Amino acid sequence: MWNPDFFEEHGYCIIDDAISESGVAEIRNTINRLCDENLLKKAGIGKEGSFELDQTKRGDSIFWINPLEAQGGTKEYLDFMSEIIISLNREFYMGVRDYECHYTRYPVGTRYMMHSDKHKHTSHRIVSFVFYLNENWTEEDGGTLRVYTEGNNFFDVLPKAGRLIIFKSEMLHEVLITNRIRESITGWMLDEQRLF
């Protein structure tokens, strides 16, 4: 359940069963179709001149979502996120004006090293969100999201189907090595409108 007070105090909130099981399955099927059609692209680190592809640092492949074309489970999820955005703006005057997100797939043996989603190339990201699609996920499957809090403490989030984590984009986090294919929708709320 979305808890704005918890988010304000801790900088994050975890919501289980954010959308219907059928919606989760539809999104998973969409990612599998994109993979079969070779439309998922290897993700890199940095922008323009500093862009690099390095599977040891970041191993996922992605496909950007156009919200205007979203259907089925993806639309159900984006509608849910729109309600969260309304809540954040109403409760905390956060100034969220837009969002961007992509389908994400990590092959077995990959990870994403510790990083922050907000830096000089992405300064307009204010809140990050990850929605997981992985059925019957266990700790032995790896692929945990580790989020760092003050004092170098951290908490781990198991990427099980239907789970959504929302957290402030400046928080350091990493994806630990996954022992199964790991799928999600990953995105960011922005304090400016995107230019297509």
Question: Where in this protein do the model-derived segments appear?
Answer:
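Catalytic core of Fe(II)/2-oxoglutarate
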Residues: H119-K120, R125, N134-F196
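Non-heme Fe(II)/2-oxoglutarate
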Residues: M1-R90
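Short catalytic/ligand-binding loop motif for oxyanion handling, primarily in non-cytosolic enzymes
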Residues: G23-A25, V108-Y112, E174-V175, R194-F196
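Extracellular structured ligand-interaction cores
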Residues: Y12, D98-E100, G109, I126-V130, ...
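Conserved short histidine dyad/triad with adjacent acidic residue
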Residues: Y103-T122
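A short coil-to-beta-strand element that immediately follows conserved catalytic motifs
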Residues: M94-H102, D141
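Short, conserved, surface-exposed binding loops centered on an aromatic residue
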Residues: R90-V96, K118-S123
